[in-house]
């Protein structure tokens, strides 16, 4: 009895073990399960088809599987039977590891189901559905896995399941059934409801949407509040500005023009009126300068300054007017843009600002040299006249040492503006009809006539209109009559090119660099009572002496008409003169009322650096003449932009006005001083009188070859003079035909080639070989 009673107490029941030992055994089981799971995943992930396995034989010594040969063999079996779906076994192990971890970490055991057998059966059934559906889908759909598995995708079982379903239900039907099995298997294996999952996802999406909507509404509310706050601040700031007093605008009045001593000297009555110490015309020939009048009052300047600030502020541009410079025609307001305001904004508002200020135009000056502000040029209500007499009587004009000083007018501050044509050295003038271009050219010509005598400056005037420059006909400064025929204009330019080449040859021979150096050598020789002979004389035995050479100014009133009639040849001649003629003392003044690219070509623009733009019709014309806009905003009636050479900023100048009566009085005064000394043949093309010869100059081209002298229209008259007087003398032909020395010498040389006269003897005389009226040959000296 005693032995029977003690037997049950000696058995080892796990449930009766202490809790610590039970927990220790549970941890050992969990670690073993974790190790098995890791080893399982390792041999599957490191599977290599080349390793030896159950499904194939291999003699490879180096096994790449991390589980060695056993692991390679076991992985080959799993993948051969299940395919890639063998990884679902790893999921099963991981689920058990996760459940064991929960049991270890909890103080109490995880509650089990009331019917553990039913729960385990449902789990295994769900796993079987997942595994079967996965193998079937793999066999039907995932054909690309064939290269990585020992057999076909899905393994042996997948091939059986997928092939049977595809044969029975077709490709699509089998796929749908397998997807249904996979979905049900997931629900049974993980013990979750798809409906609950859908509800949770929907609740999460709804929460995100409501949160986003709430944040957007809050952001809109904050933006509305900020806008209301800014609006309140702007209203307060606007009311504060209205009561602020703006600083007064600095008004700079134009300085008085300083008159030269010449004006005061001419006002004095000379003791002997018949004695003249100068051939220059008197300033009294011009109209008197009217008294200066105030164009804009200080109150108007202050009011306009505030109006400019207000109008620009209406357009969203904050500026401050810091200074005003009233002039004879326009007033420049210097404005300082606020921080962040671009200059292009103000430039684009020029037309709108002019309309709001009820003005014809407003010119915006983006850059003022030496200042950090911009300029607005507004026309004055009352325009003050700028007379040429005021500019010619100024100290600036009379103190200029250059004999090619031209009076342009006054700048915006009322100061006289003069320019030296010798430094330009050529000038391009453009402007529409009525812009004051012709008056400006007359002012330039009169400036030259008031500065230099006829022996220092000579003119060639080309006037296609036959109205503008014909008034100067007969003055001593002209080299030829005023040219009105455009073909003769081409001959005149051709002569100028030949004269330029001749002067360069002379300067090169004498070792000087420009015309001033040449004339200085002539003066020094004259002071020593010596003469410098022409090194290129046609009579080398008796060369003629050289004289001082005058500067030549060629004025073309309408370049467009000249280009249209004569064509491309004129462009080449103008380009040659513009490129080389500066040192030779030849200068161009080109004017046109059509500043288009076919008139002012790139070749001409490249060699004429000085530009004067009167009012033009468009921005394109302004860019053509100035390479920038601005001339389209001028006021006309002599308002111009003067672009000096070497600068990119044009200066606004109000041109000096000179009437036709003033021009007539000056011209009559000059005519009374002497007859013009025209150069014969200058307009005849190829027969112009000169030295050195050349193509189209001095008849060099027409006289090349024996007997070619008959091309000279005076050749027959020269032969008659020689035969009639029975004497072959250069001075005789020169005196009777009133031509130059060189031309007469060439005519005698042509007679020598034709056999009319003999060659020059040792004493410089020629014999006449032509028969007399009786038919006998007479030889006379």
From Swiss-Prot:
Residues 414-623 form the FtsK domain. The lineage of its organism: Bacteria, Pseudomonadati, Pseudomonadota, Betaproteobacteria, Burkholderiales. Belongs to the FtsK/SpoIIIE/SftA family. The chain crosses the membrane at residues 24-44, 74-94, 120-140, 170-190. GO terms for molecular function: ATP binding; DNA binding. It comes from the Bacteria. GO terms for biological process: cell division; chromosome segregation. Homohexamer. Forms a ring that surrounds DNA. Consists of an N-terminal domain, which is sufficient for the localization to the septal ring and is required for cell division, followed by a linker domain, and a C-terminal domain, which forms the translocation motor involved in chromosome segregation. The C-terminal domain can be further subdivided into alpha, beta and gamma subdomains. The alpha and beta subdomains multimerise to produce a hexameric ring, contain the nucleotide binding motif and form the DNA pump. PANTHER family: DNA TRANSLOCASE FTSK (PTHR22683:SF41), SPORULATION PROTEIN RELATED (PTHR22683). InterPro entries: FtsK/SpoIIIE/SftA (IPR050206), FtsK_4TM (IPR025199), FtsK_alpha (IPR041027), FtsK_dom (IPR002543), Ftsk_gamma (IPR018541), P-loop_NTPase (IPR027417), WH-like_DNA-bd_sf (IPR036388), WH_DNA-bd_sf (IPR036390). Essential cell division protein that coordinates cell division and chromosome segregation. The N-terminus is involved in assembly of the cell-division machinery. The C-terminus functions as a DNA motor that moves dsDNA in an ATP-dependent manner towards the dif recombination site, which is located within the replication terminus region. Translocation stops specifically at Xer-dif sites, where FtsK interacts with the Xer recombinase, allowing activation of chromosome unlinking by recombination. FtsK orienting polar sequences (KOPS) guide the direction of DNA translocation. ATP binds at residues 434-439. Residues 191-781 are cytoplasmic. It is a multi-pass membrane protein. It is found in: Cell inner membrane. This is DNA translocase FtsK 2. One of its GO terms (cellular component) is plasma membrane. Keywords: ATP-binding, Cell cycle, Cell division, Cell inner membrane, Cell membrane, Chromosome partition, DNA-binding, Membrane, Nucleotide-binding, Transmembrane, Transmembrane helix. The keyword Transmembrane helix applies. Its main location: membrane.
């Amino acid at each position: 009895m005693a032995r029977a009673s003690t037997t049950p107490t000696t058995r080892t029941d796990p449930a009766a073990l202490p809790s610590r030992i039970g927990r220790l055994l549970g941890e050992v089981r969990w670690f073993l399960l974790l190790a098995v799971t890791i080893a399982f995943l390792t041999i599957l992930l490191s599977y290599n088809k080349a390793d030896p396995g159950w499904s194939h034989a291999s003699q490879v010594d180096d096994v790449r599987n991390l589980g060695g040969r056993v692991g390679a063999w076991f992985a080959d079996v799993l993948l051969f039977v299940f395919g890639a779906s063998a990884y679902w076994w790893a999921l099963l192990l991981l689920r058990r590891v996760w459940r064991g971890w929960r049991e270890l970490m909890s103080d109490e055991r995880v509650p089990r189901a009331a019917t553990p057998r039913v729960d385990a059966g449902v789990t295994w059934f769900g796993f079987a559905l997942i595994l079967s559906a996965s193998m079937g889908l793999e066999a039907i759909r995932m054909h690309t896995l064939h290269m990585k598995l020992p057999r076909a995708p899905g393994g042996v079982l997948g091939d059986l399941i997928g092939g049977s379903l595809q044969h029975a239900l077709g490709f699509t039907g089998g796929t749908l059934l397998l997807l249904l099995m996979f979905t049900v298997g997931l629900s049974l294996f993980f013990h979750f409801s798809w409906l609950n999952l859908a509800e949770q996802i929907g609740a999460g999406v709804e929460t995100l949407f409501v949160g986003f909507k709430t944040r957007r509404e809050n952001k809109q509310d904050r933006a509305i509040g900020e806008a209301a706050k800014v609006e309140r601040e702007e209203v307060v700031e606007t009311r504060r500005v209205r009561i602020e007093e703006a600083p007064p605008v600095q008004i700079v009045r134009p300085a008085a023009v300083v008159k030269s001593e010449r004006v005061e000297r001419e006002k004095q009555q000379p003791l002997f009126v018949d004695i003249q110490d100068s051939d220059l015309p008197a300033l009294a020939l011009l109209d008197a300068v009217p008294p200066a009048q105030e164009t804009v009052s200080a109150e108007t300047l202050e009011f306009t300054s505030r109006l400019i600030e207000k109008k620009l502020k209406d357009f969203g541009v904050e500026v401050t007017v810091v200074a005003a410079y009233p002039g004879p025609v326009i007033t420049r307001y210097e404005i300082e843009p606020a921080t962040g305001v671009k200059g292009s904004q103000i430039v684009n508002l020029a037309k709108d600002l002019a309309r709001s200020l009820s003005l014809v135009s407003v010119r915006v000056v983006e850059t003022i040299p030496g200042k950090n502000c911009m300029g607005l040029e507004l026309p004055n209500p009352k325009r003050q006249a700028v007379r040429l007499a005021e500019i010619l009587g100024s100290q600036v004009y009379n103190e200029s040492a250059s004999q090619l000083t031209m009076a342009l007018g006054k700048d915006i501050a009322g100061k006289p503006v003069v320019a030296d044509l010798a430094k330009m050295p050529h000038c391009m003038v453009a402007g529409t009809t009525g812009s004051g271009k012709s008056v400006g050219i007359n002012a330039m010509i009169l400036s030259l006539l008031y500065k230099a005598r006829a022996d220092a400056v000579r003119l060639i005037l080309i006037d296609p209109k036959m109205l503008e420059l014909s008034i100067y006909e007969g003055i001593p400064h002209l080299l030829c009559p005023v040219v009105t025929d455009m073909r003769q204009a081409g001959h005149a330019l051709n002569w100028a090119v030949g004269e330029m080449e001749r002067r360069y040859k002379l300067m090169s021979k004498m070792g000087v660099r420009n015309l001033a150096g040449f004339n200085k050598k002539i003066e020094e020789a004259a002071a020593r009572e010596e003469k410098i002979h022409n090194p290129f004389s046609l009579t080398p035995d008796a060369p003629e002496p050289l004289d001082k050479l005058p500067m030549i100014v060629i004025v073309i009133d309408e370049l467009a008409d000249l280009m249209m009639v004569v064509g491309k040849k004129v462009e080449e001649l103008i380009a040659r003169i513009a490129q080389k003629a500066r040192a030779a003392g030849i200068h161009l003044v080109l004017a046109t009322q059509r500043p288009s690219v076919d008139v002012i070509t790139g070749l001409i623009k490249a060699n004429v650096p000085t530009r004067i733009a009167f009012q033009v019709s468009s921005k394109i014309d302004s860019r053509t003449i100035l390479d920038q806009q601005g001339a389209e905003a001028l006021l006309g009636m002599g308002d111009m932009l003067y672009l000096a050479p070497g600068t990119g900023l044009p200066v606004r100048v109000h041109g000096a006005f000179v009437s036709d009566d003033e021009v007539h009085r000056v011209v009559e005064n000059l005519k009374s001083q002497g007859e013009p000394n025209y150069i014969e043949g200058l307009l005849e093309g190829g027969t112009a009188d000169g030295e050195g010869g050349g193509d189209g100059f001095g008849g060099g081209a027409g006289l090349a070859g024996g007997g070619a002298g008959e091309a000279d229209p005076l050749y027959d008259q020269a032969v008659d003079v020689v035969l009639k007087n029975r004497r072959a003398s250069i001075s005789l032909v020169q005196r009777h035909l009133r031509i130059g020395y060189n031309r007469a010498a060439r005519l005698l040389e042509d007679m020598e080639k034709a056999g009319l006269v003999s060659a020059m003897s040792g004493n410089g005389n020629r014999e006449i070989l032509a028969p007399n009226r009786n038919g006998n040959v007479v030889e006379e000296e």
